[in-house]
Curated annotation (Swiss-Prot):
Membrane-spanning intervals of the chain: 30-50, 81-101, 217-237
Consequence of gene loss (knockout): Leads to high-affinity Ca(2+) influx system (HACS) deficiency. Causes a large increase of cell death in response to mating pheromone, when PRM6/KCH2 is also deleted.
Annotated segments matching region Disordered: 420-469
Biased composition (Polar residues): 451-465
Residues with PTM Phosphoserine: S291, S319
Membrane topology: Multi-pass membrane protein
Catalysed reactions listed for this entry: K(+)(in) = K(+)(out)
Topological region Extracellular: 1-29, 102-216
Alphabetical keyword list: Cell membrane, Ion transport, Membrane, Phosphoprotein, Transmembrane, Transmembrane helix, Transport, Vacuole
A Pfam family it matches: KCH
Compositional bias segments (type: Low complexity): 429-444
Family: Belongs to the KCH1 low affinity K(+) transporter family.
Gene name per UniProt: KCH1
Name by which UniProt lists this protein: Low affinity K(+) transporter 1
Length: 497
């Protein structure tokens, strides 16, 4: 039981490896254990230690008791050296435990400080969070609880047997002779009845208050000692089953090794649970938020790509008329029901928008006609837009170099901010077939002339004459591309006006 020659492994986890503030709690059971088991019990031990020192000084220096009212049952010479020897032995044991406990306390090791009573009590008194850590080292199952109880009771049995028991026996005999027996200091077998015991206590309290207080303190200390003796005897009985189980398992060489290994495993589990909690908090605060953000970005990118593919824009070689025919039709829907679609004159900027914010470009918001927010088609008024004519051939018309040279020499390219088709789209029959027929026939009719605004300066006209107008470059949805060609003059003109 008290063999320390075997080797056992001690967990190296210290309080520095833990964030002890995470274990701090103010549950009712935890606070109650701290008040009773730490503050109250250690305060009582300190008071008893001071009382023992005072009694020892009175016995050895003044050769008298601390009180002259109640005399001990044994003769003074025997009681004097018996009390003095027990008090001195308890002081020596306390100093030894303090030295060993301070060495363990400085290590900060959780397992070692938990096993040592002095270091555990010192950590608990100085830091409530460390007490919460000790309190969370769980003892799983009835076997572990019984083994821990047996170990700690047998560990403190030296002080109980050799320093406290002799003194409490003398106190018990004194209390027995004064309170329980009929006549003081006579036959101890002649006991007082329960009614006579109550009446005796009342009589002592009425005649001498100091004697009643001293008897009460002696009775209180004797009851505490009796409880410790009962726990010690219970631990001795439990040790039979505990050692039988340990020897039968053949895993541990003794009770101390089993306790140290079990505490080490519990500390490992406690540290792992604390690290998992910290990782979960970190993931919740940073990692999970970032992953959701990236998922949102991916979802937005997929939606943009899907909407762009559904639009099915043609290549750069397609004509503007084909783009108009391929334009997706949009009908707005609101909580009040479907909104009638505006019938607007199809211009170069209006066919891009047509009242649909999904297909709005950066220049259609500037050049398009204002939209009147109303659900009555009769109240809708369209702003007047000054139309300008530009003799601009389509991209397919420039396949012949002769036509391009004639147009360039004649200076027919004009700057424009809008281009109007004077006929509705429905009146254009089979535009694609006409374009295909134009490739075979050289005499294709030219598009209707467009009028230009007179506010365009001559410098813009001269610069635009040397360019070939390509409509598709104006409808790219990439905002980082430079705006070149006719759109530069359009922006300058709009800002100027």
């Amino acid at each position: 039981m008290f063999n320390h020659d075997w080797k056992y492994s001690i967990n190296s986890k210290t309080f520095a490896d833990l964030n002890i503030e995470l274990f701090r709690n103010h549950k009712f059971k935890t606070v109650l254990n701290y008040i009773i088991g730490v503050v109250g019990w250690n305060g009582l031990k300190l008071a008893l230690f001071v009382s023992d020192i005072y009694t020892c000084i009175k016995l050895l220096a003044f050769n008298s008791w601390s009180n002259n009212i109640i005399k001990p049952y044994l003769p003074f010479k025997i009681s004097k050296w018996l009390f003095s020897g027990c008090i001195l032995a308890s002081i020596v044991l306390l100093i030894w435990e303090a030295i060993a406990g301070m060495r363990i306390y400085k290590t900060g090791n959780i397992s070692l400080t938990y096993v040592n009573n002095f270091s555990r009590n010192l950590n608990s008194v100085l830091n409530y969070s460390k007490f919460c850590v000790y309190n969370m080292i769980e003892r799983k199952g009835f076997r572990q609880k019984m083994t821990f109880f047996t170990f700690f009771q047998l560990k403190d049995c030296i002080r109980l047997i050799f320093t406290d028991t002799p003194r409490q026996v003398i106190n018990g005999l004194t209390l027995w002779s004064v309170l329980v027996t009929v006549n003081k200091n006579e036959d101890l077998g002649d006991l007082e009845s329960f009614t006579g015991l109550i009446n005796k206590i009342k009589n002592i309290g009425q005649t001498n208050h100091e004697e009643a207080v001293i008897l009460s303190l002696m009775l209180f200390s004797f009851i505490i000692w009796a409880l410790f003796v009962f726990k010690f005897l219970l631990a001795v009985i439990c040790s039979i089953f505990v050692y039988y189980k340990i020897i039968n398992d053949q895993e541990y060489s003794g009770l101390r090794e089993y306790i140290c290994v079990t505490v080490s495993e519990n500390v490992d589990e406690l540290v792992e649970r604390q690290r998992k909690k910290e990782n979960d908090d970190t993931i919740y605060k940073t990692g999970l938020l970032e992953s959701q953000t990236f998922d949102d970005f991916k979802e937005v990118e997929n939606k943009i790509e899907t909407s762009f593919n559904d639009t099915s824009y043609a290549s750069n070689n397609d004509s503007m008329i084909e783009l108009i025919e391929r334009r997706p039709e949009y009908k707005s829907q609101d909580v009040c029901g479907p909104i009638p679609t505006m019938k607007k004159t199809e211009t170069m900027e209006s066919f891009v928008d047509n009242g649909n914010p999904q297909y709005t470009t950066r220049f259609s918001a500037i050049l398009d006609s204002p939209y009147i927010n109303s659900y009555e088609s009769n109240d809708i008024k369209k702003a007047k837009i000054q139309s300008r004519s530009v003799n601009t051939p389509k991209y397919e018309d420039l396949s012949s170099s002769d036509i391009f040279n004639k147009i360039h020499s004649a200076g027919q390219l004009k700057s424009t901010t809008s281009m109007e088709f004077h006929g509705p789209l429905d009146s254009m029959p089979n535009t694609t077939n006409n374009i295909r027929n134009f490739n075979s026939n050289s005499s294709r009719p030219r598009p209707p002339p467009l009028q230009t605004k007179s506010s365009i300066n001559s410098k813009a006209d001269s610069n635009d004459n040397g360019r070939i107008y390509t409509p598709m470059k104006a409808y790219f949805r990439e905002p980082d591309l430079p705006r070149k060609g006719l759109l530069e003059d359009e922006d300058r003109t709009y800002n100027y006006t």
